[in-house]
Amino acid sequence: MSCKVRLMEDGSLDEEPLTLKEIAYQKLCNNLDIISSHRPDGQRGLNPGIVLPNEICDGFLENYQRFNRPLDDSVIRLFEDTHRTSLKIVNLRNSTLSSIGLETLMRHKLFALSLWYCDMISVGSHHLLAHYGDSLRSLELGISSHLLQYAEPNEKEPVDFQLTCPHLRRLVLNGVVMHHRLQFAHLHDLGHLDLTSCVLANFSLEALGSLPNLHTLILFNVWPIANQLHAICCLRRLCTLDISISSSGNGHGTYDLPDQTLEMLMDNLRHLTHLDISGTNLAGNGVATKESTTTSGMQQSPKMEQHFALTDIPGLASRTQRPLQFLGLYHTAHWACKRHDIPALEVAGDANEQQILTAARYYHDRPVLLTRVLNDLYHLFRFENCKDIHTALDVVLSAMDRHLKFKHMQISGSATLFYIVKGRDRSKFGALLRNHIIRTLLNGMEMHITDDTMLRNGYLTLTQFHMPVDVLFEYERLIKILLHGVSKTEQEGFVQRIAIYLLNTLACQVDGRQKLFLGELGVVSTMFTLIKDRLTRSVFDDVMEVAWSTMWNVTDETAINCKRFLDGRGMEYFLKCLHTFPDRDELLRNMMGLLGNVAEVKWLRPKLMTQEFIEVFARLLDSLSDGIEVGGASASVVARVREREMASANHAYLRFQVSYNAAGVLAHIASDGADAWTIKTPSREHVLERMVAAIQRWNIKSERNINYRSFEPILSLVRCYETPQCQHWAVWALANLTQVYPEKYCKLVEQENGIQILNELIEHESPYCEIKRIARLVIEQCDSGSERMVVDG
């Protein structure tokens, strides 16, 4: 396991910062042009004069996978020249490496090779072991690495191969069909043999009897094993034996005489320190019986009977005075892990937090079993019973990182992450750890993008972070994942709703570059698809409302997105929504906010100059004076009155914003002058009169649901001396914002030279008195704000 998550002295959780060497690798991995360039054939090659020693080459491959994307042949080509590059230890996971790339690597006379989830390597490349295996000391062929097996999952025909790697010390095979001619006798140095999920068929473990240094034998999910036990008992030097299985549902792992079988193993393998019998019944039922004290019909000695009384696992009676260092009892029959007297220093099981975390540590490369362990962790966190949070978090992140392609692992891990993160102070997670959690979630969601459960878990966990600040480092990738959730999942489903909520949050409070990216990815057209669907069905829901809010955000000070809105028949959808859902105040507020952004773009304003649009905008000026009807269903008259008052206040708040935005749209249109007013009715003068009348009805202390990043569009209207009514709206907007939110907006007025512009307005002869009065309010408010800052300082 990685064990990177640390519990800091202040109680926070974080990861160790990158070392200087790791930072250098990160820089190199993100900028391959430092050492390479594209050749005439389009492939990347090392630059002339570049020579990379072994330490750098091994570290580069390791860190490229850590900091970048899975390795492919294009990167491996950097190591074609074995005179200028040198590889010894290669660990590949989730790589798209082909057989050609693998040969490039193996020509380096590797010391260790590990392949996991490398789907592109086929059995046709197994000859590479014969050609280049002489130097190998460690060979690990994990899940989906088909070098010695056929890719078809149900294919049980063995590949005819021999292990022509005479110096192997460690061999890991996963799911390989072992043929009876397979030889091991020549592997004199072999000490660690892992045959997880291998099919023995006619192969006998007696072939291992001639290995003088074999100390570890892993037979996880290998069955049937009962007929191989005598061969195992002959491996007297074993220190570690694993005969566990992931599930006993098919009858495997169930022994006729479990106590005697385990006792036989203990009698013969006296050097064992690590034993795993998870999933089996070898721990017995915990009850002493006459039969359980007999081995092959022979009575146990009085000494053995005395030892038996000290353990609840009869077959381990001989180890009560010499306990095992590790014992795997995960999902054993009769809940062996919950017994009291277990002769082992460390136990993997599901009885408590310590056993679960131990299981996660030992089973880190067994995705099916590890998924169950994560489910156990999930239940611990769900009921807030987990104390060793930093270890648990490290376990989950490591599991998800190692088994990216294993969907159920990602689903289980993301659910556990949600409960780890949920409800905890954001400051308790350091920046490095936060980034790791978010990156791991995005990796899983991206890999399993079509699975709604994975998306739901990921989205929910992301809502626990501070948006958009915490995700800016992965902003573009997250947007793509959210767009999929919005457009490719069930209409009105939970995944779609939470995806559009997050998308809207990310569209807010980001800079212009990110808003441009949103537009380029098709956010506007995606929102139109959602809106069109609901208009067709005459359905109003939160997705419809948030879709307009999202477009409001992405068009803010982003002219090209405003154009995308108009080009996508945005005004047509606006009118249809207005007519179909006339009483939806939130919807109307969002739509008019968006049109306010469009109206700020001078070269787009002519498209708003139609009689129909202007009449609608003028009518919406009077939104604040509309009547309101609120139905009451409360039994209490007092409750009904309060409900009416609250609804009325909310209605007035939303209608004020509609009126304000409508006036803003008209002010910008009118600022282009009388010649640009190309319609006869309503007349420009009539609309401006109505706009001023609306402004005079507004409360200068009204709160706002808006975020101005710049006052440039408003200040441009302050300079519009040809049309004082436009200035009226502009100075009122500044006065309102600086009165209600002085800390934020007084500073913005000053930064954008607003005080000088307002003073010029006051000195000018054109604006009428009310405009100048409001302008003075803004200046006075900003002056008082500056004085407060001096006093506070």
Curated annotation (Swiss-Prot):
Entry GO terms, CC:
Cul2-RING ubiquitin ligase complex
Intervals holding LRR repeats:
84-108, 187-210, 269-294
Q: Entry's InterPro entries?
A: ARM-like (IPR011989), ARM-type_fold (IPR016024), LRR_dom_sf (IPR032675), LRR_Zer-1 (IPR056845), ZER1-like_C (IPR055142), Zyg-11_UBL_adapter (IPR051341)
Q: List UniProt keywords, sorted A-Z.
A: Leucine-rich repeat, Repeat, Ubl conjugation pathway
Highest rank taxon of the organism: Eukaryota
- Functional description taken from the UniProt entry: Serves as substrate adapter subunit in an E3 ubiquitin ligase complex CG12084-cul-2-elongin BC. Targets substrates bearing N-terminal glycine degrons for proteasomal degradation.
Q: Which family is it part of?
A: Belongs to the zyg-11 family.
PANTHER family this protein is in? PROTEIN ZER-1 HOMOLOG (PTHR12904:SF23), PTHR12904
Can you say what this protein is called? Protein zer-1 homolog
Supply the source organism for this entry: Drosophila melanogaster (Fruit fly)
Upper lineage is:
Eukaryota, Metazoa, Ecdysozoa, Arthropoda, Hexapoda
